[in-house]
Amino acid sequence: MNIPAPRKDLMIVNMGPHHPSMHGVLRLIVTLDGEDVIDCEPILGYLHRGMEKIAENRTIIQYLPYVTRWDYLATMFTEAITINGPELLGNIQVPKRASYIRAIMLELSRIASHLLWLGPFLADIGAQTPFFYIFRERELVYDLFEAATGMRMMHNFFRIGGVAADLPHGWIDKCLDFCDYFLIGVTEYQKLITRNPIFLERVEGVGVIGREEVINWGLSGPMLRASGIQWDLRKVDHYECYDEFDWEVQWQKEGDSLARYLVRIGEMTESIKIIQQALEGIPGGPYENLEIRYFDRERNPEWNDFDYRFISKKPSPTFELPKQELYVRVEAPKGELGIFLIGDQSGFPWRWKIRPPGFINLQILPQLVKRMKLADIMTILGSIDIIMGEVDR
């Protein structure tokens, strides 16, 4: 009888690249010994579009429609960071009402991003039902976005000195109704998922990152807070009007995939608390700093000509960026989204460096999956939460 000799050589498997609507165009070259992962090499760049170079050849307002293509599931944050930098460089005051509207939109965008992380993450580890539930709630968020901004996804809503338009009549009541409904939905998720023994078996103790490790790798967002560090830029940097609201930083100390899930679920509840307080306390007044329009009036005398008087043009603030450098950041759903900006007395930035949270957080993936099983790769990758638009830029 011929007994087949056991194989001793390793197997190399390509995972991805998938379609951008799925996990994105990330390719993993995985070296396997049976079911055990020996090595994992991520291959990036399939969605690279030169976003930093495009920024250096556009004014800020011209560049705004591009930025929503970085993290296309949390577009409000990319818009916020794009206008926060020039506002700080130009020392531009933002009206209180505009700041409240921005905070509401940012937190709604955080909820939408976390929802679209939760559904596919659970589908990857075998739970199909929540995938349909999260789309039910996400549609309600997108309906609110559509009513306020005119677009469901690529909003192009933030402006230097404020926002593009005021909230429409009846929108605040509609948003408050959503908040009440969504809190019940989150409770339903927790009953369905958090104590599920099959779910716990797949995520508990998988992809553990220690406190020292998470700092050394420069991780941020839920990845950082799930490892026992209470660091949230909304509390640290005091941007927009977050200091005026009562809310708690969500954190866990275990550092595994379950801890990252619990942080994100908790953040959705805290976002609802912030939105409710902002809606109830939103002040009156202008939604945009109109003085911005006069920054560059001398450079465009044709706007004052007789021919242009009867064209309803809304001049955009193409002011000069002063000769300074600045790093500005916001707490995006995936972590610290930052921009290093250098001005040189022109309408275009001299340097526009993006610090994407997904790219930094993805660095630790090869280390996390080593000595794990093949099936754990999707659990760990899902718990990191990446969008290839911002990873590749």
Curated annotation (Swiss-Prot):
Coiled-coil ranges (or none): none
Reaction(s) catalysed by this chain's protein: a plastoquinone + NADH + (n+1) H(+)(in) = a plastoquinol + NAD(+) + n H(+)(out); a plastoquinone + NADPH + (n+1) H(+)(in) = a plastoquinol + NADP(+) + n H(+)(out)
GO biological process terms held by the UniProt record: photosynthesis, light reaction
SUPFAM superfamilies in alphabetical order: HydB/Nqo4-like (SSF56762)
GO cellular component terms, A-Z: chloroplast thylakoid membrane
Localization, UniProt: Plastid, Chloroplast thylakoid membrane
Gene Ontology MF, one: NAD binding
Enzyme Commission number: 7.1.1.-
Function: NDH shuttles electrons from NAD(P)H:plastoquinone, via FMN and iron-sulfur (Fe-S) centers, to quinones in the photosynthetic chain and possibly in a chloroplast respiratory chain. The immediate electron acceptor for the enzyme in this species is believed to be plastoquinone. Couples the redox reaction to proton translocation, and thus conserves the redox energy in a proton gradient.
Name of the protein in question: NAD(P)H-quinone oxidoreductase subunit H, chloroplastic
Organism (species): Morus indica (Mulberry)
Gene: ndhH
